[in-house]
């Protein structure tokens, strides 16, 4: 892989590294805290586990890859279902085991090469599953934007959520430079200010919260049903991880798929995810926003991500930060979520397009159709006390159909890359 850009001096003094690291955390901050706020997890804990997860990832990769790990959007709906069905502790127990998916894929890549992932999880499998992740969350976004199950008046809810959505859209489309990377942050700020003028903010939790507070740690509990439900969901973000590593490789001009190797980056992501769940935080994933910031600032030094992780851990011990985040009205988050969740579905569509999946071919048509119908229609399968439904069922069905249905004779067999 060649680098089109002139080389960048990696050596910087610690003060500059710390400042740029804080800048990287700021870029990731909006999306990082959005996941716990939506799912009911603790925002300070999410900051803590993002920092720890990034440090563990760096440990596994020899601190060679300038990438930041934080809360994964792919797990929002499963966490919401798990918390409602089994509680936070059991949901965390199931999420601990999702790291095993990364471990298994890491081993597969180590033995068979990176091309093995493409054969087991081709775009026709991953694409529709990602679409279902986004579409399954759409009703949640709309309900929050309309102020359902809350004390907000309909007119206030629609006004604030639409203003938030339009702000986020505007920044994402028209902003330049670093501003373009933080549309979620701008949307939250505008929505929050509007809520202030409407008298919808209660600052009492912030006043009561201490400056220093240990993040809320949840000890995981393990239940087979929760584990089996959550395991398959890790497939989509694990495969997307490959795209994240390819993106940062392109930005820096270094082939991280070869050194430190995809098997090590997958292992690092898996350990980060399991560690986060052990502490009560959401699973981690690579952040494209931070990769974009690396490209803009041309700071390719992996030590910057060490500083970003340290900042995240330090801020997680400030009780007033978590209390302030808890005051963000759900109608503000609803406006942002309508764009975010829709964009997840678009990523799934993009996966199919980039993979040049012929949807008119009978085999591909059957796989995509069944997965989409199962996901949107709410299909579930019971095995005694164990139930498969939603994204987990869709992932299992997509994999099985891909393995069972014969490939067209004129379909070229991809070689290991």
Swiss-Prot record:
| Record-listed uracil binding positions | 73, 240, 289
Q: Which Pfam families match?
A: Xan_ur_permease
Q: Which GO terms describe its cellular component?
A: plasma membrane
Q: What ranges are annotated Cytoplasmic (topological domains)? A: 1-13, 62-64, 112-123, 171-177, 248-260, 298-300, 354-364, 401-416
InterPro entries, per database record: NCS2, Xan_ur_permease
- What is this enzyme's catalytic activity, as reactions? uracil(in) + H(+)(in) = uracil(out) + H(+)(out)
Q: Which residues lie on this side of the membrane: Periplasmic?
A: 38-41, 83-90, 146-154, 199-223, 319-331
Q: What residue ranges enter the membrane without crossing to the other side?
A: 365-400
One Gene Ontology molecular-function label: xanthine transmembrane transporter activity
- In this entry, which stretches build a coiled coil? none
What is the role of the protein in this entry? Transport of uracil in the cell.
PANTHER family from the UniProt entry: PURINE PERMEASE C1399.01C-RELATED
Q: Which named protein is this? A: Probable uracil permease
Give the originating organism.
Pasteurella multocida (strain Pm70)
């Amino acid at each position: 892989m060649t680098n089109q850009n002139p080389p960048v001096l990696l050596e910087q003094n610690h003060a500059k590294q710390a400042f740029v690291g804080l800048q990287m955390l700021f870029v990731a901050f909006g999306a990082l805290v959005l996941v716990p706020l939506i799912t009911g997890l603790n925002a300070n804990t999410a900051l803590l586990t993002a920092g720890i997860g990034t440090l563990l990832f760096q440990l596994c990769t020899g601190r060679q890859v300038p990438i930041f790990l934080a809360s994964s959007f792919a797990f929002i709906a499963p966490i919401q279902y798990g918390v409602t069905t089994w509680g936070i502790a059991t949901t965390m127990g199931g999420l601990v085991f999702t790291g095993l998916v990364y471990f298994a894929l890491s081993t597969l890549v180590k033995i068979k090469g990176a091309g093995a992932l493409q054969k087991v999880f081709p775009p026709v499998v991953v694409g529709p599953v990602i679409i279902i992740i986004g579409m399954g969350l759409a009703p949640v976004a709309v309900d929050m934007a309309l102020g359902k199950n809350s004390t907000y008046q309909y007119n206030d809810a629609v006004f604030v959520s639409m203003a938030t959505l339009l702000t986020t859209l505007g920044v994402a489309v028209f902003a330049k430079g670093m501003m373009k990377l933080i549309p979620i942050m701008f949307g939250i700020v505008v929505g929050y200010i509007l809520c202030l003028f409407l008298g919808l903010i209660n600052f009492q939790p912030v006043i009561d919260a201490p400056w220093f507070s240990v993040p809320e740690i949840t000890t995981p509990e393990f239940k087979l049903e929760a584990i089996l439900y959550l395991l398959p969901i890790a497939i989509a973000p694990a495969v997307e991880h490959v795209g994240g590593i390819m993106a940062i490789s392109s930005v820096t001009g270094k082939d991280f798929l070869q050194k430190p190797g995809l098997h090590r980056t997958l292992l690092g992501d898996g350990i980060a995810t399991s560690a986060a769940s052990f502490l009560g935080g959401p699973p981690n994933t690579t952040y494209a926003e931070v990769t974009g910031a690396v490209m803009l600032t041309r700071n390719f030094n992996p030590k910057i991500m060490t500083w970003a992780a340290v900042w995240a851990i330090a801020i997680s011990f400030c009780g007033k930060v978590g209390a302030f985040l808890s005051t963000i009205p759900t109608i503000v988050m609803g406006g942002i979520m309508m764009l975010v969740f829709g964009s997840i579905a678009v990523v799934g569509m993009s996966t199919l397009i980039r993979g040049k999946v012929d949807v008119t071919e009978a085999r591909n048509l059957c796989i995509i159709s069944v997965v989409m119908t199962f996901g949107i229609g709410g299909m579930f399968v019971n095995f005694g006390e164990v139930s498969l439904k939603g994204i987990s069922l869709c992932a299992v069905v997509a994999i099985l159909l891909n393995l069972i249905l014969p490939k067209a004779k004129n379909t070229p067999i991809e070689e290991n890359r």
